[in-house]
């Protein structure tokens, strides 16, 4: 089986927090970060990377400058959407997320376990080099899985950061962790 390179990109800064809006677009800073992502990806233009995005506005808006520059379609894939929390009231989401992030993976709610498994399964089955525009917790799932970390939270990916992984023979391995910052989590 061929080796596949995957670049995980955390979306640019959201216009509002996840606890205030279930699907915000990008802030002005986030739009600048999306442009910076496009520039950081220029060396990959000729390498036939497919562009994949979470269905959330902030991820799609982060992908758009690259998509336009490359004249490449963005494939929307809900496997790379944020942690499932539709049954959690907006005003409780941040509190809920903080408790979930530090919970032992075996103790996670079933919908979160299924979400985590689906991300890993999808990555293992990607057949071509891909750039995936996604979220804080999705990147944590992947890096935590690779490092066999016992809880969901394993890093603090910065907005617009690029984390590189490879998939070979059904195994995911880490090439490079993207820039991190200690930030208020706005998934």
Named regions from a protein language model:
Residues 2-75, 99, 103, 107:
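Active-site-proximal alpha-helix that buttresses catalytic centers in soluble enzyme cores
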Residues 2-4, 72-76, 81-95, 125, ...:
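Acidic, low-complexity terminal tails and accessory targeting/binding regions
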Residues 6, 49, 126-137:
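Generic beta-sheet signal
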Residues 12, 136, 180:
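Active-site metal-binding loops of divalent metal-dependent hydrolases
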Residues 16-17, 84-85, 141:
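Conserved protein kinase catalytic core
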Residues 55-59, 79, 134-138:
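Short, conserved alpha-helical segments within structured domains
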Residues 65, 141, 145:
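Active-site signature of alpha/beta-hydrolase-fold catalytic machinery across serine-
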Residues 100-127:
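Internal catalytic-core helix/loop-beta-alpha segment
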């Amino acid at each position: 089986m061929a080796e596949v390179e995957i670049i995980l990109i955390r979306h640019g800064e959201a216009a509002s927090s996840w606890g205030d809006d279930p699907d915000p677009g990008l802030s002005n800073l986030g739009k600048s970060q999306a442009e910076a992502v496009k520039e950081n990806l220029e060396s990959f233009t000729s390498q036939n990377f497919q562009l994949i995005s979470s269905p959330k506005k902030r991820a799609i808006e982060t992908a758009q400058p690259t998509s336009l520059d490359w004249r490449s379609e963005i494939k929307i894939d809900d496997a790379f959407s944020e942690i499932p929390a539709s049954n959690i009231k907006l005003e409780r989401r941040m509190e809920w997320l903080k408790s979930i992030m530090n919970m032992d993976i075996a103790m996670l709610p079933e919908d979160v376990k299924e979400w985590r498994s689906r991300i890993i399964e999808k990555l293992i089955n990607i057949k071509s080099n891909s750039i995936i525009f996604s979220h804080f917790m999705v990147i944590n799932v992947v890096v935590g899985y690779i490092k066999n970390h016992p809880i969901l939270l394993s890093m603090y990916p910065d907005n617009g950061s690029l984390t590189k992984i490879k998939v070979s023979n059904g195994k995911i391995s880490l090439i490079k962790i993207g820039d991190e910052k200690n930030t208020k989590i706005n998934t």
